[in-house]
């Protein structure tokens, strides 16, 4: 039978007065009183507990006192607190005006981004002027720097054609890539012939951009990549760079597929894709149709809306959940559609009219209800033929205004239905193309973008677009460059020639990249307090930059972008904003503030802080972005302002063990090449000494660093004297003392040789959580700031390498140093030590030998075989145990029964946390034994199906490649298999929830009995003074291993079909782009396409015939 746990008061010293102690404790702990009174079925505990309460308290007090003496002695925390206390008369504590701060940051960002826009505008002007002065020359011969061929030589040592010598030098400004800052180079995808007359004329014309690229870079040295993407397929990039093919020798990068090109070339659009899945579409035709749909989906972005309808005898929404609506074409929805398209099966007879009617109805309903893009609307009809022109449907739904464009894609080589398909497109302001091979799809699909761009081109509206955050892993091969988050500013380039005005010819798009890291430097970290931060989001509510955005995941030894890294919604990071008040205000571009109580995960989610955050936000003018700044209530609302002389501060800056936060911008060092090799500390010194008057520095931050250097300077002498007193023979213990200040200054002192430091990664970039970064203060600083004044927070660190995974190596202890002026308290610094894990254990076991008024051996000791002793931290992680394998693990893993009891008593609380950026393993699919039994015929048919499928696709691509070779292409004869499925990812994006356990500090001691079947297990818990640690002593004689362990494991949040559908259909509020160009009265709608000139090959025709003769179940 369960017994009621006993609680003892920290004020009760009379062990004999047991009931007095219990009621005293209940009076002081109303939570526990409620727990006791709420379950009257539990009998009281009778008899003397086997764990002596007073002895445990003595142990905790002794260990706590010894530990406090050790950490204060070696860290010098009392001295540092005194030095800041002495400086209080010269200090000011200023209350931060969050609204003014976010406005100032926004203005600075707007100024920076405006310079990028001006650079792009100058490129547009130069390109359009060059085109105006250029006459097309079909026989033009022109050599240019081909990015793939530059510096390449043939067997005789001569440069290959288009591959002349091109000087390349490593440049720190461009992530140490080898570039040529004097000129640009030109890249073409493998499927574009590098000597096609259109290419040669375009490349020749765009040579005029070279001096503009250079001039832009000289005017604004913070510019990164500048480029021009041509509508014909070539890509001119500055600075010039050597382009490396992939492992198959293929250049798959096509600038016309990039988000910046597509967004700049067209206005937002609503698209319904209709795909014929009747029996005539079997085999290769269906493969081409699927590839065409995938290519169309790749041209859509987060400002577009889409749905896909498959038709035969009936109309089928390929995602039934999306019936009757359009959904935002974000990455998740596009990928979902691609999976469903891949599963399409052919059967029946194609009835186009009902599919057209359904598409028109959707578009009409969305337009009338003010949903979707409220701009372009289009229907994409993908079929192998149309038996009529469906004029009645168009008369009813689209004429005479023709507000919905219809684009038709005739699949296959048959031309019987070409005239009808073209008629449909031409009479609905669309475009007709015939797609005979997989290779045709890319160029054919791109035509619709050029048609949609016509109104904008004719009107000469140069809209400026900014993309969502993205990583250009396709463009760059180095990990440093490819994993860098960017946004791109882009503008369209038009032909201004009068003779082609009605055709609305888009020449291409110019753009320039802005790294979000550089942009966020304009929100200096030191102005935001210990827990504060700045973040950016887009008009669609997606995160552009946020310290809690985790865009990468680890696959083996490599970091890879998560599939949905650039469509993480603000509500998925600031998930406490359940009413989406903050999100709604920010996407609407409002200026204001909002407050929330939040749970902030720390230490990779193992810990949590409870904070009240004030959010301040405003928009960034002339961009789709909004900026938010977060300040934490309490010490986060204040900023400390000190002052000292340059001479005194400069002297104290020059100590060899002093460093500054390398991620913070004390001085701008990345513009002038002479400054790029300087550390921030070196730059500050050069600035203060006047050696380099050209350096631009943040004078406020430099002033605070000088002040902190002066105040903390005595710590170096203190630590040095301490180190001299440690003999060589003394047993190893404390190895590092350290401090950090709110200005990013870091000092450390070693008490042992560097080779003997227990954790050598500490305070280095390898342990990012332990240093100041752009995103956060060090973990030890953040935790110390939330500890009661004068107390230390302890953390156990363990090895994570392959040699000794999970082995405890070090314990870190830190405490905050505060300053109070005029009743306002601010955190000035944090100070602490790193000690060996073994040293802490030795101190503990020594303290456990203490007992009261007893001569000789103690009656009880933690070394007794009938007792278990643990030291755990305030999140339940074991720092000390007799069993080393339990150290670093959650108490619930080591003793589930005890953790369960502590939770039920309210000593610990379970806090549920959510992760909406998680990656989960796919569920295992187990097949029944019957399913796994194949007949010989079934096995043969399966193999035959696979072989035939692969042969068909290979010969289809071989046929397409042959047609390019007939035109004289000299590119490598390797075709990019874009239709093939990528290797199945082991992990997929998901939502998870996980528990974090938090000690309730009001309960400093507790004891009780746990029922474990045939025995009772007693325990005592005692707070260790001036720390975040707890001592737990339990009775080992009672085996409670039958109790399940309590783990800190993340579990995937599973949504049933109904909830999942509701989530997929839901349209979160968003702000539409400010401009729309859907129609222009001067548009030449008769420029509406023609037939493909790709010729069939004999082997392909024969194999296609075989595909038609074979039963469809063999093919798909």
Swiss-Prot record:
A Gene Ontology cellular-component term: monoatomic ion channel complex
Signal peptide (UniProt feature, chain positions): 1-47
Cytoplasmic side: 1116
Residue ranges of the motif MIDAS-like motif: 276-280
Extracellular compartment residues: 48-1094
Domain Cache: 466-559
One Pfam family matching this protein: VWA_3
Disulphide bridges, residue numbers: 426-1076
Residue positions with a glycan: 180, 643, 725
Keyword Lipid metabolism among record annotations: no
GO molecular function: calcium channel activity; metal ion binding
Membrane topology category: Single-pass type I membrane protein
Keyword presence, Metal-binding: yes
Subcellular location: Membrane
Location of the VWFA domain: 270-452
Post-translational modification, as annotated: May be proteolytically processed into subunits alpha-2-4 and delta-4 that are disulfide-linked. It is however unclear whether such cleavage really takes place in vivo and has a functional role.
InterPro entries (UniProt xref): Ca_channel_alpha-2/delta (IPR051173), VDCC_a2/dsu (IPR013680), VWA_N (IPR013608), VWF_A (IPR002035), vWFA_dom_sf (IPR036465)
Chain segments annotated as transmembrane: 1095-1115
Keywords annotated in UniProt: Calcium, Calcium channel, Calcium transport, Cone-rod dystrophy, Disulfide bond, Glycoprotein, Ion channel, Ion transport, Membrane, Metal-binding, Signal, Transmembrane, Transmembrane helix, Transport, Voltage-gated channel
Location (main, coarse): membrane
Disease: Defects in Cacna2d4 are a cause of cone-rod dysfunction. Mice display affected retinal ribbon-type synapses. The retinopathy is accompanied by a substantial loss in the activities of the second-order neurons. Rod photoreceptor responses are maintained with reduced amplitude, whereas cone activities are absent.
Function, as annotated: The alpha-2/delta subunit of voltage-dependent calcium channels regulates calcium current density and activation/inactivation kinetics of the calcium channel.
Free-text domain note: The MIDAS-like motif in the VWFA domain binds divalent metal cations and is required to promote trafficking of the alpha-1 (CACNA1) subunit to the plasma membrane by an integrin-like switch.
PANTHER family with a match to the protein in the record: VOLTAGE-DEPENDENT CALCIUM CHANNEL SUBUNIT ALPHA-2/DELTA-RELATED (PTHR10166), VOLTAGE-DEPENDENT CALCIUM CHANNEL SUBUNIT ALPHA-2_DELTA-4 (PTHR10166:SF59)
Name the UniProt record assigns to this protein: Voltage-dependent calcium channel subunit alpha-2/delta-4
Organism of this sequence: Mus musculus
């Amino acid at each position: 039978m369960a017994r009621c746990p006993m609680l003892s008061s920290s004020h009760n010293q009379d062990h004999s007065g047991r009931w007095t102690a219990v009621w005293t404790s209940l009076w002081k702990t109303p939570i526990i009183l409620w727990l006791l009174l709420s379950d009257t079925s539990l009998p009281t505990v009778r008899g003397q507990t086997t764990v002596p309460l007073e002895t445990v308290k003595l142990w905790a007090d002794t260990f706590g006192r010894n530990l406090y003496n050790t950490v204060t002695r070696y860290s010098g925390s009392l001295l540092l607190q005194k030095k800041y206390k002495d400086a209080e008369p010269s200090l000011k504590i200023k209350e931060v005006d969050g609204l003014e701060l976010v406005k100032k940051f926004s203005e600075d960002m707007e100024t920076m981004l405006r310079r990028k826009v001006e650079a792009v505008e100058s490129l547009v002007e130069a390109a359009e002027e060059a085109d105006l002065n250029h006459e097309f020359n079909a026989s033009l011969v022109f050599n240019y720097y081909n990015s793939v061929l530059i510096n390449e030589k043939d067997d005789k040592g001569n440069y290959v054609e288009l591959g002349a010598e091109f000087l390349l030098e490593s440049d720190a400004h461009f992530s140490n890539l080898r570039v040529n800052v004097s000129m640009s180079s030109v890249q073409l995808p493998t499927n574009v012939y590098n000597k096609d007359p259109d290419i040669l004329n375009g490349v020749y014309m765009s040579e005029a951009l070279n001096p503009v690229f250079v001039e832009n870079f000289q005017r604004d040295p913070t510019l990164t990549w500048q480029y021009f993407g041509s509508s014909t397929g070539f890509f001119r990039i500055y600075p010039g760079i050597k382009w490396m093919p992939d492992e198959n020798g293929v250049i798959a990068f096509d600038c016309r597929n990039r988000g910046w090109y597509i967004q700049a070339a067209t206005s937002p659009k609503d698209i319904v894709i209709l795909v014929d899945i009747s029996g005539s579409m079997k085999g290769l035709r269906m493969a081409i149709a699927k590839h065409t749909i995938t290519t169309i989906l790749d041209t859509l972005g987060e400002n577009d809306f889409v749905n896909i309808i498959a038709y035969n005898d009936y109309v089928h929404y390929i995602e039934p959940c999306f019936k009757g609506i359009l959904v935002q074409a974000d990455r998740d929805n596009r990928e979902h559609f691609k999976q469903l398209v891949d599963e399409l099966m052919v059967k029946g007879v194609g009835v186009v009219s009902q599919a057209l009617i359904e598409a028109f109805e959707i578009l009409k309903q969305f337009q009338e209800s003010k949903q979707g893009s409220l701009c372009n609307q289009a229907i994409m009809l993908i079929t192998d033929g149309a038996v009529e022109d469906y004029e009645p449907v168009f008369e009813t739904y689209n004429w005479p205004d023709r507000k919905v464009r219809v684009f038709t894609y005739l699949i296959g080589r048959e031309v019987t239905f070409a005239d009808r398909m073209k008629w449909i497109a031409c009479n609905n302001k669309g475009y007709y193309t015939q797609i005979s091979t997989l290779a045709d799809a890319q160029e054919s699909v791109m035509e619709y973008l050029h048609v949609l761009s016509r109104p904008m081109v004719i009107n000469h509206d140069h809209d400026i677009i900014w993309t969502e955050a993205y990583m250009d892993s396709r463009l760059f091969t180095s990990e440093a460059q490819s994993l860098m988050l960017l946004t791109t500013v882009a503008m369209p380039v038009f032909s201004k020639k009068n003779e082609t005005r009605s055709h609305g010819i888009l020449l291409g798009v110019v753009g320039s990249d802005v790294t979000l890291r550089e942009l966020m430097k304009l929100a200096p970290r030191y102005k935001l307090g210990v827990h504060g931060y700045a973040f950016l989001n887009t008009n669609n509510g997606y995160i552009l930059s946020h310290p809690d955005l985790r865009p990468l995941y680890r696959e083996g030894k490599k970091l890879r972008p998560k599939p949905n890294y650039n469509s993480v919604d603000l509500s998925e990071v600031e998930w406490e904003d359940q009413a989406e008040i903050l999100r709604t205000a920010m996407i609407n571009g409002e200026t204001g503030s909002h407050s929330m109580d939040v749970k902030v995960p720390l230490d990779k989610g193992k810990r949590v802080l409870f904070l009240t955050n004030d959010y301040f936000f405003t928009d960034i003018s002339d961009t789709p972005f909004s900026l938010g700044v977060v300040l934490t209530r309490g010490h986060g609302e204040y900023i400390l302002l000190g002052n000292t002389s340059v001479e005194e501060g400069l002297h104290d800056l020059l100590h060899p063990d002093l460093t500054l936060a390398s991620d913070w911008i004390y001085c701008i060092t990345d513009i002038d090449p002479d400054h790029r090799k300087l550390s921030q500390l070196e730059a500050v010194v050069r600035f203060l000494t006047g050696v380099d008057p050209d350096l631009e520095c943040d004078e406020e931050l430099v002033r605070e660093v000088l002040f902190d250097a002066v105040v903390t300077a005595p710590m170096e002498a203190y630590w040095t004297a301490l180190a001299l007193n440690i003999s060589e023979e003394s047993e190893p213990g404390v190895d590092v003392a350290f401090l950090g200040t709110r200005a990013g200054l870091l000092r450390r002192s070693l008490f042992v040789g560097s080779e003997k430091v227990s954790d050598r990664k500490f305070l280095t970039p390898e342990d990012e959580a332990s240093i100041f970064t752009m995103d956060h203060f060090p973990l030890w600083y953040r935790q110390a700031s939330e500890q009661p004044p004068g107390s230390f927070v302890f953390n156990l660190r363990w090895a994570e390498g392959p040699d000794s995974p999970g082995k405890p190596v070090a314990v870190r202890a830190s405490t905050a140093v505060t300053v109070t002026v005029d009743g306002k308290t601010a955190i000035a610094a944090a100070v602490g030590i790193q000690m060996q894990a073994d040293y802490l254990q030795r101190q503990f076991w020594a303290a456990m030998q203490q007992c009261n008024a007893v001569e000789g051996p103690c009656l009880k000791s933690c070394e007794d075989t009938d007792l278990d002793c643990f030291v755990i931290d305030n999140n339940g992680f074991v720092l000390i145990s007799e069993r080393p394998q339990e150290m670093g693990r959650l108490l619930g893993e080591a003793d589930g029964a005890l953790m369960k009891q502590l939770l039920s008593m309210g000593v610990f609380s379970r806090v549920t946390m959510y992760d909406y950026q998680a990656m989960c393993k796919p569920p295992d699919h187990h097949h029944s034994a019957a399913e796994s039994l194949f007949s010989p015929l079934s096995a043969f048919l399966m193999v035959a199906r696979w072989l035939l499928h692969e042969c068909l696709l290979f010969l289809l691509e071989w046929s397409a490649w042959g047609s390019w070779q007939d035109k004289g292409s000299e590119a490598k004869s390797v075709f990019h298999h874009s239709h093939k499925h990528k290797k199945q990812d082991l992990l997929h994006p998901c939502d998870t929830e996980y528990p974090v356990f938090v000690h309730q500090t009001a309960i400093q001691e507790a004891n009780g009995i746990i029922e474990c079947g045939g025995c009772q297990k007693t325990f005592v818990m005692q707070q260790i003074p001036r720390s975040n640690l707890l001592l737990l002593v339990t009775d080992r004689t009672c085996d409670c291993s039958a109790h399940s362990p309590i783990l800190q494991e993340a579990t995937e949040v599973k949504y049933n079909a109904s909830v999942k559908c509701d989530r997929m259909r839901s349209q979160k509020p968003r702000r539409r782009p400010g401009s729309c160009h859907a129609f222009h009265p001067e548009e030449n709608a008769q420029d509406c396409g023609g037939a493909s000139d790709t010729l069939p090959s004999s082997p392909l025709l024969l194999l296609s015939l075989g595909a038609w003769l074979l039963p469809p179940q063999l093919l798909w």
